[in-house]
A protein has these predicted regions:
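Active-site groove signature of glycoside hydrolases
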Residues: 1, 24-34
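Glycine-rich tight-turn/loop motif centered on a GG-T
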Residues: 1-7
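Residue-level marker of alpha-helix boundaries and capping positions
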Residues: 7-8, 100
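Acidic, His- and aromatic-enriched active-site or binding-groove loops in soluble protein domains
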Residues: 9-15, 53
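Anion (oxyanion) recognition and catalysis
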Residues: 18, 22, 114
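Surface-exposed helix-capping loop/turn segments at secondary-structure junctions
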Residues: 21-28, 163-167
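Hinge/beta->alpha junction and helix N-cap segments in small-molecule ligand-binding domains
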Residues: 37-38
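Histidine-acidic metal/acid-base catalytic patches
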Residues: 41-63, 68-167
């Protein structure tokens, strides 16, 4: 359980970093990370609350569908709650594999993106243990069904299909 002091420190640091970045026209995206990797900012709601508290216009939300699958009860609601504060999304499947073959509710996510008129970055984030060192770096203990090229091509095709269906 985090303390009030930790929350205050987080806000002080974010405010200082945001002010420094703003001088160069940089927007910072804060990514909620699942509870197994962090105890601070594990959901979109928490990050948005801290962003509101810091009140820096160049702080934004950076979602990741892998972490959303663990921490969020919906793929739609966090997108709607973020609105224009959402600027960047890591697109990855629940098992870090091929988009569309896992548990991520892609239609809900893309419906939300359409409703907020999202114009930020959709970034493919696949991991294959065919890449040396990747298995240990991201805890991919089972063999990948696809090599890195197959994952990239198939997932990009899926993203394009979903984007076209939700315009």
């Amino acid at each position: 359980q985090r303390t009030r002091e930790e929350e205050n420190t987080l806000c002080e640091v974010w405010a200082e970093v945001a002010e420094y970045a703003a001088r160069s026209g940089i927007t910072i995206g804060i990514e909620p990370i699942n509870r197994y990797e962090s105890y601070m900012c594990t959901s979109a709601e928490e990050v948005l609350r801290f962003i509101k508290r810091v009140n820096a216009p160049n702080l934004s939300l950076h979602l990741d569908t892998f972490h959303m699958n663990i921490e969020e009860t919906s793929f739609y609601e966090p997108v709607i709650a973020a609105g224009s504060r959402l600027r960047h999304i890591h697109m990855t499947e629940s098992d870090r594999g091929m988009l569309g073959e896992g548990n991520v509710r892609w239609d809900d996510l893309f419906r939300g993106l359409q409703e907020i008129d999202f114009n930020g970055n959709l970034v493919l984030e696949n991991f294959s243990n065919s890449v040396p060192g990747m298995a240990v770096a991201v805890s991919l203990w089972r063999p990948s069904k696809y090599n890195a090229d197959e994952l990239a091509k198939g997932s990009l095709a899926f993203m394009r299909k979903m984007t076209c269906e939700h315009q």
